[in-house]
Structures are given as structure tokens and as C-alpha cells.
Amino acid sequence: MAADLLCMGEPMLEFNQLPPGPDGRSLYLEGHGGDTSNAAIAAARQGARVGFITALGDDPAGASFRALWAREGVDAATVRTDPRHQTGVYFVFHGPDGHSFLHYRANSAAANYAPPDLPEAALAACRILFLSGISQGISDPAADAAFAAIAMVRRAGGLVAYDTNYRPRLWPPARAAAVMTAAIRQADFVFPGEEDARAMLGLADPDAILDHYLGLGPKVVVLKLGAGGAYLGTREGRVRIAAHPVAAVDATGAGDCFCGAFLARILAGDGAESAAAYANAAAALKCTGYGAVAPIPTPEAVRALLARAGRGP
């Protein structure tokens, strides 16, 4: 069965720091991460038909991802195994100022993915392709593959969704802004982050950020504001979506969850405002547990939160 949503990027095995035990030492919860993989799982949990495009190493981490996607209903038929390169790994640390990351991704299997590896038939058949700044920032071949995938989808009449997800350790702001701008000019849905816009564009005002990205051509821009909720912009108008107060312990992957849930609802026929309200609730619930994947909520949990907040349909 063809995937309606194809996500493309870098999966990474995750080790997430837990609160210190009685002896003061921290343990690390093994899990799975990578922004577009997180989004793929979030969309699949909301009922979308999802596939993934990447390369994994021929290693236990790669096997773990294949098992995860099988459990979550994410089609991995378009995932290559690269026997020469390993699957990436990262650590999440928690402190008084929030969470921080340490990545081991240099020369990973995903970073060596190139245009000839692309599954053209699957791309032509999908309704939406989702990718991110990380998808392109990990290497030049990966950036080229992303542009080639976008071209294949657009030629077939599909839509493109893009999350900026700027990581300064991957590339300098000027190059990141140039590459992302070229991709976003071909996108229909764009999900910038407040911190990304400040770092790459020098913009802090939410309306100025929406003005910038809508000016590049996308139909819908959703500015992710973290604890501040979200700000939706279209050619017709703008809507602020209030955050949900939750007992947050780990925001890792919350933005990815937002993107996946939003796209799942778009595929289900929702309008942009309804999809953004749903995704905002899903992202809030994700923050109530540790790890990028395990706390991603079910539709029942999301609708229950919306109902409690008086924001249900």
C-alpha cells in the first residue's frame, strides 16, 4: 500500500538522561530519535499511511529502527541498508535551562544518502513529502537528495512540507538560510521555529517571521512557539493557538510531533487551523514523558485534552 506521507531524513538512536538516582548518578533511557522519524511515527499514531526514506547502517541501531517502524506502522520499504556506514547516535541532557544534545552523526549512513538512492516511484505516488533543515544539513549529498526528492514529488503533483530545524553545529547560518530558502520556495507547508528564525534570519517578532516565510511562497506557515503555543499564517489570515498547560518533563521531539500530527490531520481532510490546534495538543502531551518517541500520544489522548480545554470539535 502506497504511503500518503513520505518522511525523509536522519534517524538516530537516542540516549535520554533521566533524573539522578539516590547515588547522584544519571541513567540514560534508550530510545529513538531523528526529527523526521519522530514526525513519521507521530503521523502514523494519528492514523496516517506513512513511509520513510533514508539509509541505516548494518548494525544493531539500524535493526532497532526497522523493528520500531514495523511496530509503529511506518513502511520502511524505501529504507536502504548501507554496509559501509553506521547509524547515528545522540544523547539528551536535561538542566535548569532546558535540554541540550550531543550528536555522533559524522559520516553516518543517512549522511551518505545521495540522489541515485531515491525511490522515484514511491515519491511520485505520495501525497506529501516531509523533510527538514536537518535532512539537508547533515551533508551535501543529503541536501542534493532532498532537492531531487522535492522535484520528483512536485512533478507528480504532490505537496511538500518543510521544518526548518536549524542546527548551527551542522552548518553556518548563511548557508543554512540559503539552502532552506531554496527548499521552502518549493514547499506548501512550512514549520519554522522561533529560535531558528532568530538565529538564521535575525527575526524575533512572530509576525515578521510569518511575513518572511509566507513571502517565499508556501500556502501555510505554522510558527512553533514551544511553551507559547503556535502561530498559524496563511494568505487569508493569522491565528494564534494557545499552549496547553501540562506537567512537562522533556520537550525533545515536541516540534517533530507537532509536524507529524499536523500533516496527519491535513491528510485526513482537516483545514490548517483545525490541524494546527490538534497538533498543538499532541505536542503538549508529548512533553509529559521522556524521549522523543515513547510519549507521542494517541488520537484518543489528544482529543481528550482538547475536550478538557474546551477546544474540541
What is each model feature region?
Residues I128, I134-H212, G228-A230:
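Conserved beta-alpha-beta core of the PfkB/ribokinase-like small-molecule kinase fold
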Residues A43, G193, G255:
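Short, conserved phosphate/pyrophosphate- and ester-handling motifs at nucleotide-, phospho-/glycolipid
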Residues M1-V74, A247-V249, P313:
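Glycine-rich phosphate/adenosyl-contacting loop at the front of the ribokinase-like
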Residues L5-C7, V160, V190-F191, V221:
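Residue-level marker for buried hydrophobic side chains located in beta-strands
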Residues M1-L6, A151-M152, G202-P313:
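Conserved phosphate-binding/catalytic region of the ribokinase-like
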Residues R49-G133, A304-R311:
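Conserved N-terminal subdomain of the carbohydrate kinase-like
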Residues F15, L102, L170, M200, ...:
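Residues that scaffold the ATP/ADP-binding catalytic core of kinase and kinase-like folds
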